[in-house]
Amino acid sequence: MSQAAETLDGWYSLHLFYAVDWASLRLAPKDERDALVTELQSFLENTATVRSSKSGDQAIYNITGQKADLLLWFLRPEMKSLNHIENEFNKLRIADFLIPTYSYVSVIELSNYLAGKSDEDPYENPHIKARLYPELPHSDYICFYPMNKRRNETYNWYMLTMEERQKLMYDHGMIGRKYAGKIKQFITGSVGFDDFEWGVTLFSDDVLQFKKIVYEMRFDETTARYGEFGSFFVGHIINTNEFDQFFAIS
């Protein structure tokens, strides 16, 4: 039996994707639409207060293409807090005009593939804590996609030795380091939580960097032989004070 990688786990993560039912929203009176937006703004401004206490974070993006219109990403210390947020969001009047298109449940994760030997408690290391309990960068653009490590008769990631996986992940990580300062990456583990094994969330002020890093990593052995991917979502940041314009119908 191959040795399983150990993980450090941080905040729980919930990506929620919605399409706006513009046809139904268009039929609502303007004063009702204004009230819907005000209620939504108030809700999201309230959930964002966790930033000041460093007990979570969130990000809101306008997704490009027909897979979704909105992405709401929430990070919290407990899974049940994500349940509460989702339930309360579904009770908002705007929810009657939003169609869920996708969601992803996971937890911020760091593996021990590239970790050095140390006797210290990793959860007390400031650098590790900043990655497990992050302050999101709120860059102009976001990219999210789920992924698996392939396991079939020809290529099975889970049958490789720890040493083989460490070597592959080292080479994989060296490509990522080339994009330091251009892309901020968050890996969330989802084995037992969702249909894929990991979620990858990328932030950048230059949307083209997403294409560059994903394409370059296609030639990396870790990805070429063992990577399997779900749908990609990309979008531009939207602030709550921009909702009036976003939901405006002339």
UniProtKB/Swiss-Prot annotation:
Pfam families in the record: Chlor_dismutase (PF06778)
Cofactor: Fe-coproporphyrin III
EC class of the enzyme, as a word: oxidoreductase
GO MF terms held by the record: heme binding; metal ion binding; oxidoreductase activity, acting on the CH-CH group of donors, oxygen as acceptor; peroxidase activity
Catalyzed chemical reaction(s): Fe-coproporphyrin III + 2 H2O2 + 2 H(+) = heme b + 2 CO2 + 4 H2O; Fe-coproporphyrin III + H2O2 + H(+) = harderoheme III + CO2 + 2 H2O; harderoheme III + H2O2 + H(+) = heme b + CO2 + 2 H2O
Protein family membership: Belongs to the ChdC family. Type 1 subfamily.
Protein name: Coproheme decarboxylase
Organism: Staphylococcus aureus (strain bovine RF122 / ET3-1)
